[in-house]
UniProtKB/Swiss-Prot annotation:
The gene is ipuF. Gene3D superfamilies: 3.40.50.880. Its EC number is 3.4.-.-. Disulfide bonds: none annotated. It is an enzyme of class 3 (hydrolase). PROSITE patterns: GATASE_TYPE_1. This is Gamma-glutamyl-L-1-hydroxyisopropylamide hydrolase.
Length: 295
């Protein structure tokens, strides 16, 4: 029986991975590894760190069934060595013919690697879109796109970013947006197809609380929260947010504008990428005989 081989690329530097481990319990790449293996035990994962110096110890990129790029604390427009290494890696990934997926930084990286542009948020009242992206709407193209299968046409979702896509590359189509930002794209570039989202469908409330704590000082500095205590209060409230949970009146302030009753906690776009892009591509590419069991 065949097993999918997915390469997970952590977008963070070594120092930032250590910071996430302190506040969340693990680096983002480990979160995605657990998510994929919990979804289906037939998935084999490898983790790579393209921001780090030195050669990447991976198979040829065309040997993988999928390449998944996590979020990151980095800013793609800064000419840091780790950023430049990741752009080069993403360009090679596009040339490999392997299906790609990116979350937050992962989407921004793909946009830049394919010739687009990402800059700091230009929205006056939203220097950092967190803890939620509200009012996300599927575009006419996105409403029929398999990446968003089972999504409602409008939704709220966990989010954490201070940069935005300002120019799309050729071959890119927006599949979701809200009033402030491009929220999801498909990019056909080189030999590969990329699906990506600006928001974080992989996070639980507990995970998002850890993200807030990890970036607490910067959230106060950029005006997203008034004090570190305000960040902590928000983190405590969001850590308890899960399907069916009742939000106390004192915590409602942290969920302003969020439809908590219809909030979708499943990582739909990632699972749809596996089912609707990775698996069909692998069957064509490697001549699979149908051994994959979908959940």
């Amino acid at each position: 029986m065949e097993k999918l081989r997915i390469l997970i690329c952590d977008g963070n530097t070594e120092a930032d991975r250590a910071s996430f481990k302190k506040f969340v319990g693990c680096a983002p790449s480990k979160q995605f590894e657990s998510l994929l293996k919990n979804y289906n035990s037939q998935i084999r994962t490898e983790i790579a760190f393209p921001a780090d110096p030195g050669p990447l110890m991976t198979l040829p990129l065309g040997a993988y069934d999928g390449i998944l790029i996590t979020g990151s604390n980095s800013h793609i427009y800064e000419a840091q060595p780790g950023n430049l290494r990741q752009i080069e890696f993403a360009q090679k990934a596009f040339a490999s013919g392997t299906p790609m997926f990116g979350v937050c930084w992962g989407m921004q990286l793909a946009v830049v690697a394919a010739g687009g542009e990402v800059l700091p948020s230009r929205v006056a009242d939203c220097s950092c879109e967190t803890p939620f992206a509200t009012g996300v709407e599927l575009t006419s193209y996105g409403s029929g796109h398999p990446m968003h299968h089972s999504r409602t046409s409008g939704f709220d979702v966990f989010s954490f970013h201070s940069d935005e896509v300002t120019r799309l590359p050729g071959g890119a189509v927006v599949t979701a947006r809200n009033r402030n930002f491009i929220q999801a794209v498909e990019i056909k570039h080189g030999r590969s197809t990329f699906w990506g989202v600006q928001y974080h469908p992989e996070l639980s409330g507990w995970d998002q609380a850890g993200f807030l704590r990890e970036s607490a000082r910067s959230l106060v500095e950029d005006g997203s929260y008034e004090t570190l205590n305000h960040v902590e209060h928000a983190a405590q409230a969001i850590s308890m947010f899960k399907a069916g949970a009742q939000i106390s009146e004192e915590n409602l302030v942290h969920f302003e504008g969020v439809d908590t009753n219809s909030f979708e906690f499943r990582p739909l776009e990632i699972l749809n990428w596996l089912d609707h892009l990775v698996i069909p591509t692998a069957k064509r590419k490697f001549g699979w005989g149908g051994g994959w069991l979908q959940k």
